């Protein structure tokens, strides 16, 4: 599942997927996600980054390293060297100091050993005048009240790390932490307060955080690589650069204006909304749906997928699921609560009207504005009726309920308005039409939905049906036109997400190749920005995290031994995809991935995207002739995210997320385990959350739990639902949807616990690490938790925060920190939190 949140869906070109991801990938981005079963979870979405880092030329050796440092790092390194020198001098002085002064120091240490966290007057190292000086945090005991030592022997000063990696990690944290806050009261503010204060949300974004920073860095790097004037031996890489250039060709877009879209409308039989005398006698419902799906990838009234049969993952099969709405998946509340969301629906109405008016003007059409507006009202009213029959996402977590194997002939009874066999034969490649007949198997996710949508279609005028279908096609394709449509969309986004202005065009265009040619774009990125040593280090961490999960299973007292053994076997069977697929290093094999797709600099942007849709769909249908490939690494390496696929039982960590500030081979292990280690643990735990637990080690949907263990799991799961359901989201009056977010919350909780235990085991086997410079008063176990929280630093506009509550299966970032740590006794021990402190409640929810 995803690891974050995002705005509604305003673009159609994406693959469908069942993967659980670290953060939600925005549906209005161009980053693709692996194809998958529609029944499992919402399609991945991607959060819009902001401008942070602009990469320049590469440098070699020490000069390259120094030039790549930030200003803060350059300033901190000389300070660090001076600190080391002064420390050596100080030690020499201490050795020769009078014993009377030594005893006096010992007495003072005894008096201040129990100094409180939040009282600066009792802590001589922290003053009210300098709140940025970190407080002395007592080193972690195993008991909340450590025994007071009376030894007169001076404690040994902790070793401090001075490597570039330590300096860089320390800089990240020093620039983020608000150490005037007691970590036991609000650890999110403690770890992120300064970062959030010093990083306003850019006008071209609805939210900004450390995750968005990483996304933006990758996007900037891709931009530089795609703009290189080079021709390579790889045709697919050349096509990736040609796609970027066509997207950036504003001159051509301005010349074409709405011409390409009018060609589309003509192909589909004209849009009644724009026509004076639309001929309803030419209406053919099946043909309308065929042309929309086959040529433009737009599903209306139902969604069609090809993926592994959930109960026999050796084979691929057809899936049909309920529709999405124009505002995106999970947005039904916007339509159903028109009082609360009146401003949003007003913005949507205006958005539709402005697009229609622009098309009318460009086409020199004569239909009156009043008639057009009347049709627009009917479109919105119809979509409200459609929203009423769509099943809410938080009611779609029982995957067995969603698995209904039928035959195509059964669809004629459920939705008879569609002539199903010709429909499938028409959208499939011509060499595969023989696969579709009355007895062809298909898995239906929502049977009652199809019955209800049939009733809605039956009572709706054919003109309105055509208006709605073509509106969905228009909405999906206006982004490939000139910037007038971007201006219209931006006015809409200002209300829906709080985003104040459109991003520069290159930001969107840099992501387009990752949609059309994800592996080719990823190959460009990996060659320039990913080290093989990091791949090996990530693999070692995965092994450690997997062992840590197995230890948690063995240690728990609520599963029987047989179920424990099956759970551990499933964890040990997980497939690891790290960094990039091997094909990205083999250019001839890479080019074979894109046989049948031809893109050149002479192609218009609109035509490239249309060709890509047709090619993608043909490739998807070909999967029906092949076994399901559980080892397919079908995600662009340039994606900043992580994934778990239940049908593959596979975890995937693209190169894009294996980057600072979340991971580096030069970072201390405490930093890596707290950040990317928690991500790895998160994805492993997805195999054992409320949905992943329904699948076995081979990816098949069947119950492998004993009744008693399943009942115990359900009790613990409900605890998580209730805990998060009681959190009120900042800037809104809404509470977190504990039911919708439970899978991600279970994964967060398990992931951090696994990562912490894995780090503790590392220390046991390898010894304590030196501490971070400037933060040496914090133990490395304390830094582990700072590193985890730092992953989620950031904030959102009010509208975006509201949208997240309604549509996203992830909790807001603050609760991904507070919610997890409130359930970890180890955190309370490390920070010596008193009983019933805000981040150390007596009642804790523990699944894994």
From Swiss-Prot:
This is Neprilysin-11. The active site is at 683, 748 (proton donor). The lineage of its organism: Eukaryota, Metazoa, Ecdysozoa, Nematoda, Chromadorea. Keywords: Cell membrane, Disulfide bond, Glycoprotein, Hydrolase, Membrane, Metal-binding, Metalloprotease, Protease, Signal-anchor, Transmembrane, Transmembrane helix, Zinc. It comes from Caenorhabditis elegans. Residues 133-144 have a biased composition (Pro residues). Binds 1 zinc ion per subunit. Disulfide bonds join 161-166, 184-833, 192-793, 247-509, 719-845. It is a single-pass type II membrane protein.
